[in-house]
């Protein structure tokens, strides 16, 4: 068997039996969790395919290790390698302290145009949770990754640049509601039709491919009408234009209410649901954040902008056990580029202690296996995590909250997962 690159074809990824996949080990606890995760992934692939498939791991540098080795936090060679090999896995990265150096995670997303942050959130039986019914949470978040106020277009208070921006806004654009112009910093919030459409397209296609029931467009369009409000409208428009016979939208529902009454609209939606159509709906962000606590079962796939998605993803993760067990991926569904990553930080005080929970990067690797079409290996890991947590053999973060738990190290937890692969 010869290791080969994954390539992008007209119908999606072309995945060889021995793909070369770059990995970034990560800072802080990165080496601990990656060592555990890679053993679990390799064991699951071996068990699923009896040696007919395997992954050839290729280390690339980013973060502290890259800086110590090359003097750069994110070497161009790393970006070029990921561009060439399409798929990568990464541990948590330190954001360098100091002005002018952006988050390495954000830099990777922007340089590779990874426009979707994919965050599936579900509960594993036995995981400690602060809510009464964590089992009702089963959502997949599609967070737009390249626009919104996270685009990094900011001007610091007191600088020549911000004075120019404020002067332009006040004198050229007639903006009279900058309350304290002399002491304000300014941030720009770009939201485009193209950026919205490619995100919503990916979310709806995911819902169709995975037999989900609905896609909720989450926004603050009631306040920010030409950015978040446009996101909502562009999302609805795309749903009907590109997926017309496969979806039923709340805007269609409202039109039926206006013409034929609410009873007729309810009948139309029930008919669409029975036919397996995806219901496209929307929710204002603050109401949505209430509903994920009070009635989470009403939401399935979620498409939202960058800032909303950041809040929502971590708020949902807290309901099912925290970011230690939350997977994440950053994907460009058009070019095939994707990075699968731990969603938590570097936790430097635990570095090298062989103590922390490796589940986030393991479950992110499950997403990677699913993305590659290696569902059998992915399912084996998911089932093993379920069985292992149910048996109460867990790392310290869960053990301290579970009665009768056996606390084990990072490496011992990986051993248990490998033992429970079926």
From Swiss-Prot:
Similarity annotation: Belongs to the isocitrate and isopropylmalate dehydrogenases family.
Binding site for Mg(2+): 310
The protein's name: Isocitrate dehydrogenase [NADP]
Site (Critical for catalysis): 150, 220
Residues annotated as binding D-threo-isocitrate: 103, 105, 109, 119, 143
GO BP terms in the entry: glyoxylate cycle; tricarboxylic acid cycle
PANTHER family assigned: ISOCITRATE DEHYDROGENASE [NADP]
Swiss-Prot/TrEMBL cofactor(s): Mg(2+); Mn(2+)
Broad enzyme group: oxidoreductase
InterPro entries per the UniProt record, alphabetical: IsoCit/isopropylmalate_DH_CS, Isocitrate_DH_NADP_dimer_prok, IsoPropMal-DH-like_dom
């Amino acid at each position: 068997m010869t290791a080969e690159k994954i390539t992008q074809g007209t119908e999606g990824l072309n995945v060889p039996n021995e793909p070369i996949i770059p990995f970034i080990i990560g800072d802080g606890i990165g080496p601990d969790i990656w060592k555990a995760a890679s053993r679990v992934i390799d064991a699951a692939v071996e068990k699923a395919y009896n040696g007919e498939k395997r992954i050839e791991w290729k280390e690339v540098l980013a973060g502290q290790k890259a800086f110590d080795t090359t003097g750069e936090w994110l070497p161009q060679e790393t970006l070029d390698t990921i561009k060439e090999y399409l798929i990568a896995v990464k541990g948590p990265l330190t954001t360098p302290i100091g002005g002018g150096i952006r988050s390495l995670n954000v830099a990777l997303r922007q340089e590779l145009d990874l426009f979707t942050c994919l965050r599936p959130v579900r509960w594993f039986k036995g995981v400690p949770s602060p809510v009464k019914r964590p089992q009702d949470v089963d959502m997949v978040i599609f967070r737009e990754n390249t626009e919104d106020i996270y685009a990094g277009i900011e001007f610091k208070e007191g600088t020549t640049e911000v004075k120019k921006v404020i002067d332009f806004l006040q004198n050229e654009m007639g903006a009279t509601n900058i309350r304290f112009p002399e002491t304000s910093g300014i941030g720009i919030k770009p939201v485009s039709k193209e950026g919205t459409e490619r995100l919503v397209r990916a979310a709806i296609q995911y819902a169709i491919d995975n037999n989900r029931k609905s896609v909720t467009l989450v926004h603050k369009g009631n306040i920010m009408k030409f950015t978040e409000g446009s996101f909502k409208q562009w999302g609805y428009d795309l749903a009907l234009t590109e997926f017309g016979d496969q979806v039923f939208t709340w805007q269609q529902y409202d039109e039926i209410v206006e013409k034929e009454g609410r009873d007729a609209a309810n009948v139309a939606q029930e008919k669409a649901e029975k036919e397996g159509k995806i219901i496209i709906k929307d929710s204002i962000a603050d109401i949505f954040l209430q509903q994920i606590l009070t009635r989470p079962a009403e939401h399935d796939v979620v498409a939202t902008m960058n800032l909303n998605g950041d809040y929502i993803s971590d708020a949902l993760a807290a309901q099912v056990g925290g970011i230690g067990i939350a997977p994440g991926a950053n994907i460009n569904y058009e070019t095939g580029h994707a990075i699968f990553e731990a969603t938590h930080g570097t936790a430097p005080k635990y570095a090298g202690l062989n103590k922390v929970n490796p589940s986030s990067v393991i479950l992110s690797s499950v997403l990677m296996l699913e993305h590659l079409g290696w569902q059998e290996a992915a399912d084996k890991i998911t089932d093993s995590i379920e069985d292992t947590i149910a048996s109460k053999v867990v790392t310290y973060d869960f053990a301290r909250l579970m009665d009768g738990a056996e606390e084990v190290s990072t490496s011992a937890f990986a051993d248990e997962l490998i033992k429970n692969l079926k």
